[in-house]
Each structure stands twice: as structure tokens, then as C-alpha cells.
Amino acid sequence: MRPEKRSFSIQGHRTSISIERAFWLALKQAAAEDDTTLADLISSIDKARGEAGLSSAVRVWLLKRLQERAAQVTANTK
């Protein structure tokens, strides 16, 4: 799996993110579920990332989202 690079404008400046296709698909799905644009979702991740690189922050954000959803499903089945 090779990372795919895409560019966005975030807070008035252009930036690029290189993540694997599976992460792009998950990110697009998350944006659709949250009724927001991909650029706005990436911007919100960017604002909360601290010193981590943006690509890493996106991957970690997606992992945390998946873990939270799995925990909700587990809690609802008990």
C-alpha cells in the first residue's frame, strides 16, 4: 500500500497529506457521517493535533474514532 498525496487549504495555507487509500476512504466516510467537508474535517484534526505531523494525526484520529464506535457497539450489546 502506497500513500496517496492530496492537497488542501487549511486556515488560509496549502498543505499536503500523504496517507494510504484505506485511510482516505475512511476519512471521506467520516466527513459524510459528520455532514462536513473533507477539508473542514482535516482542518479540525489539524487544530487539535499538537506537534504531530498532520498525516499521522489523521491516522490516529481515525483509529480513535473507530475505537470509540466499537466501544459504543460493545456497550449497546451488553
Question: What does each model-found stretch correspond to?
Answer:
Residues 68-78:
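Short, charged, intrinsically disordered terminal tails
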Residues 4-6, 75-76:
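Non-transmembrane, interaction-prone segments in cytosolic or luminal domains
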Residues 5, 9-62:
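Amphipathic, hydrophobic secondary-structure cores in small proteins
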Residues 65:
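Short, basic alpha-helical nucleic acid-contact segments in DNA-binding proteins
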